Amino acid sequence: MLRIAIQTKGRMHEKTAVLLNEVGIRLPAAKRTLLIQSNTFPAEILFLRDDDIPQAVANGVADVGIVGENEFHEKKQEAIVIKQLGFSHCRLSLAIPKEEEYPGLHWFFKKKIATSYPKILSAFLKKNAIEADIHFINGSVEISPGIGLSDAIFDIVSSGSTLISNHLKEVEIVMYSEAILISNKKLDEKKNKILQELIFRIDAVQTANDKKYILLNAPNDSLQEIFQILPGMKSPTIFPLAKKGWSSIHSVISEKQSWEIINKLKNAGAEGILIVPIEKMIL
């Protein structure tokens, strides 16, 4: 049984729950408790505060965890980063009052900076030879300059709307962050085998995220031109149609390129083009 620590609530919790469902880890519909066992995968889910997850994994309270890179780097716990998960993207940035002119990093010299991430900020300032006064605040960092607690802040930025509503502007991006899968360094063979299955399933879901399944009909004399348009994984699948001289072609394309590819296929004589989502892809 593999114990997976995830965030108790919030946006990352919601997206983590979606990922777990996509990889086949479904939880009972009963009221959530601190620890729940999956009925479809040899795992149990431990619900924790996001800043407690790195330590829980490092200490073996949980075997693996899903947490933001920002929390992992701030806590500096002895755990292994297995992979980035592609959601809950944000950045850790320095922000100052919007009316201030910003000539560069030296603006922060001897300034008071409020943050919930003192270790990351301290390392950044030291690297850039900036001496500043770091004030640790656990939450609501963005209000600090407005009430006179600090001159600037160092905090998570997603859309930037929170900064705007507090009359702040982002001036330096220190690091980018997203959800990551971390693991305890000393998993036994049985737990490691379950972890490898989990990684395999996550890879299958991630690979499919930007892919679409495409089906189309085309005259046989256009097949070679169409093959040049379709990237595919190896080569397109072809089925003869009842209509003489025509074939049905199946392949996989990138969603980002789908409209460009569709236009090229139409110009090459393709008809009846269907684009279908892919849930999982095993390469």
Curated annotation (Swiss-Prot):
Q: Which GO terms describe its cellular component?
A: cytoplasm
State the Gene Ontology terms under molecular function.
ATP binding; ATP phosphoribosyltransferase activity; magnesium ion binding
Q: Which domain of life is it from?
A: Bacteria
Pfam families documented for this protein: HisG, HisG_C
Biological process (GO) annotations held by this record are: L-histidine biosynthetic process
Regions annotated as coiled coil = none
List, alphabetically, the Gene3D superfamilies matched: 3.30.70.120, Periplasmic binding protein-like II
> Where does it reside?
Cytoplasm
Q: What is its EC number?
A: 2.4.2.17
**Entry keyword set:** Amino-acid biosynthesis, ATP-binding, Cytoplasm, Glycosyltransferase, Histidine biosynthesis, Magnesium, Metal-binding, Nucleotide-binding, Transferase
Which reaction equations make up its catalytic activity? 1-(5-phospho-beta-D-ribosyl)-ATP + diphosphate = 5-phospho-alpha-D-ribose 1-diphosphate + ATP
Tell me which cofactor or cofactors this protein depends on. Answer: Mg(2+)
Activity regulation: Feedback inhibited by histidine.
The pathway it acts in is:
Amino-acid biosynthesis; L-histidine biosynthesis; L-histidine from 5-phospho-alpha-D-ribose 1-diphosphate: step 1/9
Family indicated by similarity:
Belongs to the ATP phosphoribosyltransferase family. Long subfamily.
Q: Which PANTHER family match?
A: ATP PHOSPHORIBOSYLTRANSFERASE (PTHR21403:SF8), ATP PHOSPHORIBOSYLTRANSFERASE ATP-PRTASE (PTHR21403)
Cited function: Catalyzes the condensation of ATP and 5-phosphoribose 1-diphosphate to form N'-(5'-phosphoribosyl)-ATP (PR-ATP). Has a crucial role in the pathway because the rate of histidine biosynthesis seems to be controlled primarily by regulation of HisG enzymatic activity.
HAMAP family tied to this protein: HisG_Long
- State the protein's name: ATP phosphoribosyltransferase
**Natural source organism:** Azobacteroides pseudotrichonymphae genomovar. CFP2
